[in-house]
Swiss-Prot record:
Presence of keyword Acyltransferase: yes
Annotated PROSITE patterns: FEMABX
Keyword annotations of the record: Acyltransferase, Cell shape, Cell wall biogenesis/degradation, Cytoplasm, Peptidoglycan synthesis, Transferase
UniProt name for this protein: Lipid II:glycine glycyltransferase
Top-level EC class: transferase
Tagged with keyword Acetylation: no
Gene: femX
Organism for this UniProt entry: Staphylococcus aureus (strain bovine RF122 / ET3-1)
EC number(s) per entry: 2.3.2.16
Subcellular location: Cytoplasm
Catalytic activity: beta-D-GlcNAc-(1->4)-Mur2Ac(oyl-L-Ala-D-isoglutaminyl-L-Lys-D-Ala-D-Ala)-di-trans,octa-cis-undecaprenyl diphosphate + glycyl-tRNA(Gly) = beta-D-GlcNAc-(1->4)-Mur2Ac(oyl-L-Ala-D-isoglutaminyl-L-Lys-(N(6)-Gly)-D-Ala-D-Ala)-di-trans,octa-cis-undecaprenyl diphosphate + tRNA(Gly) + H(+)
GO CC entries: cytoplasm
MF terms in GO: aminoacyltransferase activity
TM segment ranges: none
Amino acid sequence: MEKMHITNQEHDAFVKSHPNGDLLQLTKWAETKKLTGWYARRIAVGRDGEIQGVAQLLFKKVPKLPYTLCYISRGFVVDYSNKEALNALLDSAKEIAKAEKAYAIKIDPDVEVDKGTDALQNLKALGFKHKGFKEGLSKDYIQPRMTMITPIDKNDDELLNSYERRNRSKVRLALKRGTTVERSDREGLKTFAELMKITGERDGFLTRDISYFENIYDALHEDGDAELFLVKLDPKENIAKVNQELNELHAEIAKWQQKMETSEKQAKKAQNMINDAQNKIAKNEDLKRDLEALEKEHPEGIYLSGALLMFAGSKSYYLYGASSNEFRDFLPNHHMQYTMMKYAREHGATTYDFGGTDNDPDKDSEHYGLWAFKKVWGTYLSEKIGEFDYVLNQPLYQLIEQVKPRLTKAKIKISRKLKRK
């Protein structure tokens, strides 16, 4: 086994074709991290000119100290049963990490627990410290240890039928409601950033500046690994649909009124059907007024939701999503998710990753909403083997990885107690 000097294109091709490859190991992903102070180095090992393992090493300086952290996000990309390749990757990583004054090498492979026996044993044998099997969104990890994944290598009907029944009905309703899902371009990021700001204010989290999303799009779109989707509501088109539905409802009422006059047996049923139709008419009249007001203000329509869809070979990722507070009954997110899954499948993906979650959290957990949303899309829980540290500077590692988190947790507890008072 020997070190190899390969191009960025060769590195990315290996990552995209390997079962343990991941978006975060693509060379263009490293470019997106520069804004937050990370820089990258890359290593590769192989035999007789054939690549057998690669890794992208991210480095970030420790504040006020002449040291760095070496972080191999979702790496190494290697067959973990191949001890020789794994050992060679670690040797190469140590050499570079020491030159960059790293206090530790941190990895979190894209290897699931049920397939990770070799990885666990071999990494521990090499001296890696395993950080345990904690909850998926534990703050002790950089990347979530658990994500929710939908298999999408199936036809449209099979994909839709893989969703939970209630969610399946919502998707079908969303398809009828009259929104349009667009694959947008860089200009659309302005709209997406505005939607993200609205989402953050509604759900209580800090949002990124537009430059952050431009950075991701610019780095990965050229290779087809980043796409922006937006969902638009056209008022004129939907006013026509509402008018058609109103006409149908009035016709239905007339039909049941006629039956009431000709059949006493059907009178009760007919009255119920008439009442139901009248309720629908009232709702549609309200909707029509809202759409007419929208048409006056925004005759070209408005965008209701958006998302960034990412790729790494046969894996696709729902990375960021945002939505408006208006016209939520049109279920734009449901239309968008189904459309993005189909697009991902048509462009070579077999899986669609919704991102991090805990495993069936309690209803009072802050993470329950995420779990509840992600579990209805025909997903399975992808539980990774977790995070590992290879310590290069024990005193500094002890200070940064163990003492500092304890102090932070203590400050949080004190702050919460003071707030209660």
